[in-house]
Design a protein with these regions (language model features):
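Short amphipathic alpha-helical segment within the helicase RecA-like ATPase core
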Residues: 1-248
Length: 248
């Protein structure tokens, strides 16, 4: 998934955004988030809540197509619980629900316009990171060693996160979030590899490759260096394998 930060205001409005889908939050008390209100120009979202088509419970969803007054092809209503001061748990549930819905859409791009500044005891950077990491979790496939790999995820491939302003600090937070998510997925992938593949030598190679790609230093100690450092406990464990020990 490709992520970006998109700021909306009175001139560059959410309603005018041309995209495959906009995800906005609604609440159990039949109240609309600010983004939902901005799209509810003809009362269709309010009507959907009043009719009971969506409960507003965290993770509930309702897809509306061709909503009057909006340029988006689809509007996804996502429940975020009872409290407009959103809990961390409810925010993550809503994000996961939106991502699940995105995966089954014919659209290729979308906007997540959630109340990212209303999560209890969390800041905007946390909300951006939560969205990115949830996406990485949803897309991860443990199929590296399968003879037939799982098909690539369909649906939405580009997501813009709506925020009050696209500041350099927020863009840096997005870049950091993507890096964290990629690192988590690399860790999962290494952990899922069979031990005859993911050997100490293999791990050392991965470390050196990362160092070359991202410009940091890495040192890999071999058996002689470990003996010189008197790392007896480490070497004792390594004696149980034919593979040469490496300490990264």
């Amino acid at each position: 998934m490709d992520f970006s930060i998109k700021a909306f205001d009175t001139k560059n409005t959410l309603a005018a955004a041309k995209t495959g889908c906009v995800a906005v939050a609604v609440f159990e008390n039949k109240k609309l988030s600010a983004a939902a209100k901005a799209l509810d120009q003809h009362g269709d979202i309010t009507a959907a809540l009043k009719s009971g088509d969506i409960s507003g419970k965290a993770g509930s969803t309702l897809l509306l197509r061709g909503l009057a007054g909006t340029s988006a092809q689809r509007v996804l209503l996502v429940g975020m619980g009872a409290d407009e001061t959103v809990s961390e748990k409810n925010f993550v549930s809503a994000v996961n629900a939106a991502l699940k819905a995105f995966a089954s859409l014919g659209a290729t791009d979308a906007i997540i316009a959630f109340p990212v500044e209303q999560v209890k005891e969390r800041d905007l950077n946390w909300a951006v990171r939560a969205i990115v990491i949830a996406s990485n979790d949803a897309e991860f496939r443990a199929d590296r060693q399968k003879s037939k790999r799982d098909p690539a995820p369909a649906g939405v491939r580009k997501v813009a996160i709506a925020t009050p302003a696209a500041t350099p600090a927020l863009k840096a937070a997005l870049a950091q979030s993507i890096a964290i998510g990629n690192g988590m997925n690399l860790t999962r992938e290494l952990g899922n590899l069979s031990p005859n593949v993911c050997t100490p030598t293999y791990l050392a190679g991965v470390a050196r490759e990362l160092a070359g790609d991202y410009g940091f230093d890495v040192e890999v100690l071999d058996r002689k260096q470990l003996e010189a450092l008197k790392m007896g406990s480490f070497l004792a464990v390594a004696k149980g394998s034919e593979e040469a020990p490496k300490f990264i």
